[in-house]
A protein has these predicted regions:
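Short, acidic, Ser/Thr-enriched surface-loop or helix-capping motifs
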Residues: 114, 295-297, 406-407
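Flexible, glycine-rich terminal cap/loop adjacent to redox cofactors
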Residues: 7-35, 48, 53-59, 351, ...
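Beta1/beta-strand and adjacent pyrophosphate-binding region of the FAD-binding site
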Residues: 1-12, 173-183
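Glycine-rich flavin
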Residues: 2-4, 20-27, 33-173, 206-210, ...
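Short hydrophobic core segments
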Residues: 7-9, 117, 135-145, 179-180, ...
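FAD-site-proximal beta/loop scaffold in flavoenzymes
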Residues: 157-174, 260-340
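Glycine-rich dinucleotide-binding loop and its adjacent helix/turn
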Residues: 47, 144-199, 203, 233, ...
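Short glycine/serine/threonine-rich phosphate/pyrophosphate-binding segments
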Residues: 14-21, 161, 185-189, 195, ...
Length: 470
């Protein structure tokens, strides 16, 4: 048995960051991982592979407009998507990033323990790999992540009925892909495969796509999906049964649409489930409600010295949230062991969210409805990318930015973007919200020309109906 100051179970973006931060603060740290490589779902089966697919789809789509950019004599009529090459490139990027995490562990002198980690009480962890070992630690951080949610009657088989893990290794282009779930995962894969040439039907139980985003964003995304990519979006609809045939599947719909859809593949993108079973929580005083481990503002559970972060706690399921939670947990653990450090709990009202479909979507803060529900007197400013020179240069003059503000003080309550590079533009919004900028301050902030960022002061001016370029 080895004794550590800190053991982290799970090496995703929450776990590996927590391990590094603990080691930086002088804690003898171990990181437990059950899979073959470090990085967790985000690196191997989630964020990174999915965005690699999206980039391939974006490049493929751009080829069709080469002549508009003055690139002549290129015959794109014979162009086709090579999914095997996309999968191969995805694999190279994943391996490269995994090696980077391996290097960081060595650099920070973090001990790697290979196997399935399980709490067995009294600060001890069983690690079951090629052999079974038991190690102990003064502090333990759980970062066990999540898995694709299985729906009764719609079980995946990895062939025709897929989850978000399976589809990342698909080497044959679906002729017709039905996607159940219009959240971030669903719209990203809809955008990917529609651009690569698949017919796509997108099924969402809620009354709109991306139901947690501002309603104006959802409406715009549906319009662009339907108009530009011919994606068949069906909301207020669910799949009640699936019949498998040779070479196809038949989905029975109910709700606003009662059609039968025959397709080549079905992707289940209806969320994920936290991994909180079989990890030994019953041997602790930690509380679990509806599958989530309950924690305080420094990620500490009801069990002394036991922390939980990432997808197993009821906070936004985002890699960057997990990473920051890992830092908070590691710093509190170090502080409680006598290190001179002050942890900074996360302000969850200022978490940026990104969806990497085309057009991209990003947001931070309150939606217009949320703000009104919380009692604010709301003023909204919305400005399109269409008049922006840089958007037209890129050939992507679609979408808009929307600012939600409070009329009393001019405080910016939320910023919502749909359009080119939205997931990069949101970084400015994080700074604006963090600095508690007012609409008036933003109106008088100078942005360079020509850039996409010019939409920010224009949207601020739109709050007072004073936009210059519209």
């Amino acid at each position: 048995m080895a004794q550590f100051d800190l053991i982290v179970i799970g090496s995703g973006p929450g776990g590996y960051v927590a391990a590094i931060r603990g080691a930086q603060l002088g804690l003898q740290t171990a990181l437990i991982e059950k899979d073959g490589g470090l990085g967790g779902t985000c690196l191997w089966r989630g964020c990174i592979p999915a965005k690699t697919w999206l980039e391939s789809a974006h490049r493929y789509e751009q080829m069709a407009s080469l002549s508009e950019f003055g690139i002549a004599n290129v015959d794109t009529s014979k162009m086709k998507a090579d999914l095997s090459a996309i999968v191969a490139r995805k694999g190279k990027i994943v391996i490269k990033n995994a090696k980077g995490i391996d290097f960081l562990m060595k650099k920070n002198k973090v001990t790697i323990l290979k196997g399935f980690g399980k709490l067995i009480g009294s600060g001890r962890v069983e690690v079951k790999g090629e052999t079974t070992e038991i190690h102990s630690a003064k502090k333990i951080i759980l970062a066990t992540g999540s898995v694709p949610r299985e729906l009764p009657g719609l079980e995946t088989d990895g062939q025709q009925v897929l989850n978000s893990d399976h589809i990342l290794d698909l080497t044959n282009l679906p002729s017709h892909l039905v996607i159940l779930g219009g959240g971030a995962i669903g719209v990203e894969f809809a955008s990917t495969f529609a651009r690569l040439g698949s017919k796509v039907s997108l099924i969402e139980l809620a009354d709109r796509l991306l139901p947690i985003e501002d309603e104006a964003i959802s409406v715009e995304l549906s319009k662009i999906f339907t108009r530009s990519y011919k994606i068949d979006c069906k909301v207020k609809t669910k799949i009640t049964s699936v019949e498998k045939k040779k070479g196809s599947i038949v989905c029975q719909l109910s709700g606003a649409c009662n059609d039968r859809l025959e397709a080549s593949h079905l992707l289940i993108a209806a969320g994920r489930s936290p991994v909180t079973s079989k990890i030994g929580l019953e041997s602790t005083r930690a509380k679990v409600e509806k599958g989530y481990v309950q924690v305080n503002d420094v990620m500490l559970t009801a069990e002394e010295g036991l922390y939980a972060i990432g997808d197993i706690v009821n906070t936004p399921w985002l890699a960057h949230v997990a990473s920051d939670e890992g830092i908070v947990a590691a710093e509190h653990a170090a502080q409680s062991l006598g290190k001179s450090i002050e942890p900074h709990p996360i302000n969850y009202t200022r978490v940026p969210s990104c969806v990497y479909c085309d057009p991209e979507v990003s947001s931070i803060g309150l939606t217009e409805k949320n703000a009104k529900d919380q009692g604010y007197q709301v003023a909204v400013g919305q400005f399109p990318f269409m008049p922006m020179a840089k958007a037209n240069i890129l050939g992507e003059a679609h979408g808009f930015i929307k600012i939600v503000s409070d009329t009393k003080y001019g405080e910016i309550l939320g910023i919502h973007i749909i359009g080119p590079k939205a997931t990069e533009l949101i970084a400015s919004s994080v700074a604006l919200m963090g600095g508690e900028f007012t609409v008036q301050t933003l109106m008088h902030t100078m942005y360079p020309h020509p850039t996409l960022n010019e939409v920010f002061p224009e949207a601020a001016r739109a709050v007072h109906k004073q936009s210059i370029n519209m």
